[in-house]
C-alpha cells in the first residue's frame, strides 16, 4: 500500500508519470532528434538511403544493427544497388563528443567489399558530419606525402525514410592493403619474433579499455590506445608498454644530440605530420587522434599517421599551434620536446622546402573550387538541423573564410620555420607563476599563468588548483 500523506504528493507523482511518457527514456537519449524532418535532400550530389532491419533509430555505439542501403547519383556515375535490390550491411554509432550531438556520426560494416563513390573497395566506412576542414585537411595529407590518408566524399543521407543531412563518407583507419598497408599482428599473440611489428595505435585523449597509460612527464599522463591488435596477450602488453616508455624516455633525453628517439620513430613522417597540424592550426594535433603505425621488420620504425579529426581555428597565428592552446584541457604530447632537437627541425625544414610550392599553389587552388558543388546540399543540411535563433552562413562564405585562414597559416609557417632566426622562442614559466589544475587522482589537465584561464570551461568535476579544491558543477 502506498503511504502518501498529501494530495500534492499524489499529483506530483502523477505528473512525473505523465512526463516520463512524453519524454525520451534514458535508453533513447541518442536517438535521432526530429528537428525539421520535412526537409528534403538537394538531390544535387549522391544520396545514400539506409533502412535499419527493425525500422528503428541507431542508438548504440557498441552494438551493430542490421540494415540495407543503396546509393543514387544524379550524374549516374557512382550509383550502387537499388530501392528494390538494396545491399546488406551493419551500422552503429561512433565518436565521442560528436555522438552527443543531434546529428549523429555512424560506422558502417558492409557484408562485402565494395567501392563507394569511387574509393577503393572495403567493408569498413564511416559517415562523418560534413566539415570543411576535414576535406581541406585530407587533401593536404594526400599532397604532403603521408604514407596513407583516408579518402572522403560528400554525400546526402536518408535514414529510415528521413533526410538526416550532408555527411562525409570516409575510409576508416585500419590495417589493410588499400589503407595502412603493413603486416597485421593477431590478437593475443605470444610469438616473440612477431610482437614488435604490425601495430596501429593512437595517442588518445579519452580513456579506453584497449589502452596502456603512463606518466609522460611531471605534468601529464599519456594514453596509448592499441587499435590493432586490440586484445593483447601478456607478452604483447609488456612489449608495448616497454616500447613506449622507452620511446618517451628517448624523446625527453636532456642531451638531444645523443638522443635515440630517431632510431624508433620515422623522422620524415613526423615532420610531415607536424607541418599538417601547424598549417591547419589544429589544436587537437598532438593530444588526440594522433595515430602511429609500425610494420614488421628489423629496421621498422613508428610512422606518424594517418591523420584524422582535423579542424582549423580560423585565427591569426602568433605561435606554433600547440603552444597557443596552453589553456586547453588536454596536453600536446611530445612535440615540445621534439622541437628542441636540431635533427627534427632540420627534417621539418627539408620537408617544407619540398612541399611549400605544392601548398601555395595546388592545395590553395583546390580549396577555392572544391566546395562549390555542395552548396545546395549544405543549405539543405542547415535547414534540416536548424537551431532557433541561429543564423548559418552559406557554404561559399564558410569556404572563403577557411581558405583565407589556411593561406595565412601557410605564410606564417613559411616565415617561422623551426631553428630559423624567425622561429618562436619557447616561453618557460616558473612553477611559482603557473596555475596547475589537477584531477583528484593527481593528473595534470591544464597549466596557465592566469588563474581565470586555468579554470575556464573545465568539464564537470572536482579539481585541485593551488592546493585548493575547485568544484565545477
Put a short name on every predicted segment.
Residues 28-139:
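Conserved NTP-binding catalytic cores of kinases and kinase-like/nucleotidyltransferase enzymes
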Residues 10-21:
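Bacterial N-terminal signal peptides
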Residues 21, 25-29:
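Boundary at the C-terminal end of the N-terminal hydrophobic targeting segment
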Residues 144-156, 282:
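Short, well-structured beta-strand/strand-turn elements
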Residues 112-115, 129-131, 145-150, 162-275:
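Internal "kinase-insert"/substrate-recognition segments embedded within catalytic cores
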Residues 28-40, 417-432:
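Low-complexity, Pro/Thr/Ser/Gly/Ala-rich linker/spacer regions in secreted
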Residues 45, 56-58, 87, 101, ...:
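Middle-to-C-terminal accessory/interaction subdomains
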Residues 423-473:
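C-terminal outer-membrane/trafficking sorting elements
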